[in-house]
From Swiss-Prot:
Name of the protein in question: Chitooligosaccharide deacetylase
Family according to the record: Belongs to the YdjC deacetylase family. ChbG subfamily.
Record organism: Escherichia fergusonii (strain ATCC 35469 / DSM 13698 / CCUG 18766 / IAM 14443 / JCM 21226 / LMG 7866 / NBRC 102419 / NCTC 12128 / CDC 0568-73)
Complex and partners: Homodimer.
Pathway where it operates: Glycan degradation; chitin degradation
General function of this protein: Involved in the degradation of chitin. ChbG is essential for growth on the acetylated chitooligosaccharides chitobiose and chitotriose but is dispensable for growth on cellobiose and chitosan dimer, the deacetylated form of chitobiose. Deacetylation of chitobiose-6-P and chitotriose-6-P is necessary for both the activation of the chb promoter by the regulatory protein ChbR and the hydrolysis of phosphorylated beta-glucosides by the phospho-beta-glucosidase ChbF.
NCBIfam families: PRK02134.1
First-tier enzyme category under EC: hydrolase
GO cellular component term, pick one: cytoplasm
InterPro entries, sorted: COD_ChbG_bac, Glyco_hydro/deAcase_b/a-brl, YdjC-like
GO molecular function term, any single one: deacetylase activity
Length: 252
C-alpha cells in the first residue's frame, strides 16, 4: 500500500540561512513542502527563492509569537511586538480572539501578495493554532479558503468537531527534532506512523544553514544536522523502500 509523505520545513522567511537550507533540502533532499512566516525578516528573500523552486509547495506559517503583527493587536502585543506570553494568556482565558481572527486574514492576504498564489496549507509558529481557543478560528478559515491544515491529532479535540470540508494528513509528527537527529530517527517516525495505519503523514523539520539569526535561536545547530540527514541519498531510498511517496498537501 502506497502512503503519502509530506516533509514540511517550517520557518521559511525566518532568515536567509533558513531559506537557503530549505531550498537545498528541497533540491537535493526529501523536503517537499515549506511554510512561510509572512512577518519574517527574510520573507521577501524566501518569496524570491521559491520562484526558482517550482517543486517546493509553500504554505503559510501563522505567526502569533514573534515579530510585529500586520494588524493592530493591542490585546496581544507588548510595545507593538508579539511574544511567547501568549501561553500565559491562553491559560488565563485572556486571548483576544477577534484580533487573532483579523490577523489571520491579514497574514493570508499578505502571503498571496508575496507568492502570487494561495498557500497550499496553514500551520503555525510554535503550534499556536492548536490552542483550543484558536483552533476553531483557523480550522474554519482554512475550510472557507479551501486549503489544508496541519492537525496534531494528539491534541485534545474530536475529529467530529472539524469542518467537514477541511483537508489534512491522517498523521503528523514533530518527533524529528532535538539533539539526536539521525536517519534512524526519521525512519522511526515513518515506522510508527505505519503501525498506526496512517495512509498520509506530515513530518515537520527545520533544515537551515547557520547565520546570525539562527545563531540566536535556542534551536540552532540541530538545524544543520537536519539538513545533512534530509539530503542524504540513503534516506530517500529508505523512504521509497517503506512504500512512501513524497508529496505535499496538494495531494491530500
Amino acid at each position: 500500500m502506497e502512503r503519502l509523505l509530506i516533509v514540511n520545513a517550517d520557518d521559511f522567511g525566518l532568515s536567509k540561512g533558513q531559506n537557503y537550507g530549505i531550498i537545498e533540502a528541497c533540491r537535493n533532499g526529501v523536503v517537499t513542502s515549506t511554510t512561510a512566516l509572512v512577518n519574517g525578516e527574510a520573507i521577501d528573500h524566501a518569496a524570491q527563492l521559491s520562484r526558482g523552486a517550482p517543486g517546493l509547495a509553500v504554505g503559510m506559517h501563522f505567526v502569533l509569537t514573534m515579530g510585529k503583527p500586520l494588524t493592530e493587536m493591542p490585546g496581544l502585543t507588548r510595545e507593538g511586538m508579539l511574544g511567547k506570553w501568549i501561553w500565559q494568556m491562553a491559560e488565563e482565558g485572556a486571548l483576544p480572539l477577534e484580533e487573532i481572527s483579523l490577523e489571520l486574514a491579514s497574514q493570508y492576504q499578505r502571503f498571496i501578495e508575496l507568492f502570487g498564489r494561495k498557500p497550499t496549507h496553514i500551520d503555525s509558529h510554535h503550534h499556536v493554532h492548536m490552542f483550543p481557543q484558536i483552533f476553531p478560528i483557523v480550522a474554519s478559515f482554512a475550510a472557507e479558503q479551501g486549503i489544508a491544515l496541519r492537525i496534531d491529532r494528539q491534541a485534545v479535540f474530536n475529529d467530529s468537531d472539524l469542518p467537514g470540508e477541511l483537508r489534512s494528513s491522517q498523521g503528523f509528527s514533530s518527533a524529528f527534532y532535538g539533539e539526536e537527529i539521525s536517519n534512524a530517527l526519521f525512519l522511526k517516525v515513518l515506522d510508527d506512523s505505519s503501525h498506526r495505519g496512517e495512509r498520509s503523514l506530515e513530518v515537520m523539520c527545520h533544515p537551515a544553514f547557520i547565520d546570525n539569526t539562527i545563531r540566536q535561536s535556542a534551536y540552532c545547530f540541530p538545524r544543520l544536522t537536519e539538513l545533512d540527514v534530509l539530503t542524504s541519498a540513503s534516506l530517500k531510498y529508505a523512504i521509497a523502500e517503506r512504500g512512501y511517496r513524497l508529496g505535499s498537501y496538494l495531494d491530500v
